[in-house]
Amino acid sequence: MHAYRTHNCSALRRANVGEKVRLSGWVHRKRDHGGLLFVDLRDHYGLTQIVADSDSAVFEKLDQLRLESVITVTGEVVERAPEVVNPNLATGEIEIRASEVDVQSFAQELPLPVAGEADYPEDIRLRYRYLDLRRDRLHRNIVLRSNVIASLRRRMIEQGFNEYQTPILTASSPEGARDYLVPSRVHPGKFYALPQAPQMFKQLMMVAGFDRYFQIAPCFRDEDARADRSPGEFYQLDFEMSFVTQEDVFATIEPVLAGVFEEFGGGKTVTPAPFPRIAYRDAMLYYGSDKPDLRNPLKISDVTEHFRDSGFGLFAGMVAKGGVVRAIPAPEAGKNSRKFFDDMNNWAREEGFAGLGYINIKNGEAGGPIARNLGEDATQKLLADLGLGENDGVFFAAGKEGEAARLAGLARNRVGELLDLIEKDSFRFCWVVDFPMFEYDEEAKQVIFSHNPFSMPQGGMEALETKDPLDILAYQYDIVCNGIELSSGAIRNHRPEIMYKAFEIAGYDQAMVDENFAGMINAFKYGAPPHGGAAPGVDRMVMLLAGEPNIREVVLFPMNQKAEDLMMGAPAAVSERQLKELSLRIAVKPTQKSAS
């Protein structure tokens, strides 16, 4: 018999009754039923119930063990009585009558419980992450992550991609988020950077003639944490393809993503390919966001002209100054009390906006300050154009276009949730396309890149030379699922002359481009194919599939919101010897010990 186990803790069934077996695992729960001691033994695979009589040689040893001690149990598989069969447990028809127990490791008193899913302070959970990971939900999330990555790999290889690894130590880039810097011992005063993404390397691979590249890529960005973003590092399905159009990229990755979500989505509905395409301007108009959640059926309308020179002076004044008015429908909201509408207005103020106007309709009668000031005819025309019913409501966001769109988008989400309109048990994908290439920076008083400076402008050099920069669109796209951005991507600008011109419009001369992006721009001068790709976030995919609200619930050893690893004590001070080797001196001494 094996020294530790003949089976795992999820393997035994009624067919094994009468067999002598050996299991190893953690003491999950103990129950003393007056002369009978029951122990739930847990391993990676599941649970098996162990039973010992009070006159058994192993009773006292089991009774004295703390939860989470690691033991090896030898005994006979016996059938449970019908009244104590547990249909919710894979091994629920049997139990092991213990004859031998060997303690492999004693557990101290636990700082947090493993059994159950009690909500516990996050700092404790992260400090003792190895205990937290024993909990069933979190354990399943990490296994799910492993399976998702394996499925992504298989599907990409089936599409003709090869997996390659790009460098982790690279050069710092002036674009994007803050870099994590690594000092060089050999070159004092110089620094490597951890890659924010393998962007330049994967493009250089296309220049080198590798046609289809992918990797599960670690990425490092010194940026603040959010619910859907880990501080420090994250992983993405990074891929790039040569000689492709935007539609080729879409057609390649859609079946990969749809397939993974169908495989691991637990029967939830998944948007079939091809995914809907929504222009950026339409996304901002109809959904108030470039990350639209299509589970929400509500669409925003522009009603600016209804308020131009209208009787509602507040909105009329905003429109006269170049502002806009956006309407967010609220089906059947008129059946609610006025408090529903006032609460929405108060919520908007709490979010930092001036407020949210509204009209509530009860049995066909429009109420509220806006309806009174607009007048009956203008109000009825507005409601008719919006297609509202006799007990609907509508909210209004007014102001500068960007601000009004943002408020309208947030209000759309909130109304959808409050009125229970969000489609359940579904994953709704879409592409957001036709992003603007440039935008105007009010503070700097100049045109800057709107998003990705390395994407190909639609219309190429001709567009850059003849069109207003603010009218130029880019071959740039985002893939969104349930309101969460999974990836940005683009058809790349592979022509040096077009790249120089695009950067010139954004205020960079040729010397600056050559200095900051020498590796890529020089490579493009030796023959570069048209190419494009994207990089869907693995962490966010798993978060959606696991139904978790926070990305830290699907990461093995995450940092906290302050970018601290409480378990390993990072970041931490280093010795003077280490600093001297790197030719570094700390200008500001840390005032307190972090991650302690």
Curated annotation (Swiss-Prot):
Positions annotated to bind L-aspartate: 175, 221, 451, 492
Location of the region described as Aspartate in the Swiss-Prot/TrEMBL record: 199-202
Swiss-Prot/TrEMBL GO biological process terms: aspartyl-tRNA aminoacylation
Residues the entry annotates as binding ATP: 221-223, 485, 537-540
Superkingdom: Bacteria
EC category: ligase
Coiled coil: none
Catalytic activity, reaction form: tRNA(Asx) + L-aspartate + ATP = L-aspartyl-tRNA(Asx) + AMP + diphosphate
Keywords in alphabetical order: Aminoacyl-tRNA synthetase, ATP-binding, Cytoplasm, Ligase, Nucleotide-binding, Protein biosynthesis
Protein location: Cytoplasm
Site (Important for tRNA non-discrimination): 33
Gene3D superfamilies xref list: Bira Bifunctional Protein, Domain 2, GAD-like domain, Nucleic acid-binding proteins
Matching Pfam families: GAD, tRNA-synt_2, tRNA_anti-codon
GO terms for cellular component: cytoplasm
Complex formation: Homodimer.
Similarity comment text for this entry: Belongs to the class-II aminoacyl-tRNA synthetase family. Type 1 subfamily.
Known function: Aspartyl-tRNA synthetase with relaxed tRNA specificity since it is able to aspartylate not only its cognate tRNA(Asp) but also tRNA(Asn). Reaction proceeds in two steps: L-aspartate is first activated by ATP to form Asp-AMP and then transferred to the acceptor end of tRNA(Asp/Asn).
Protein name: Aspartate--tRNA(Asp/Asn) ligase
Native organism: Zymomonas mobilis subsp. mobilis (strain ATCC 31821 / ZM4 / CP4)
Gene coding for it: aspS
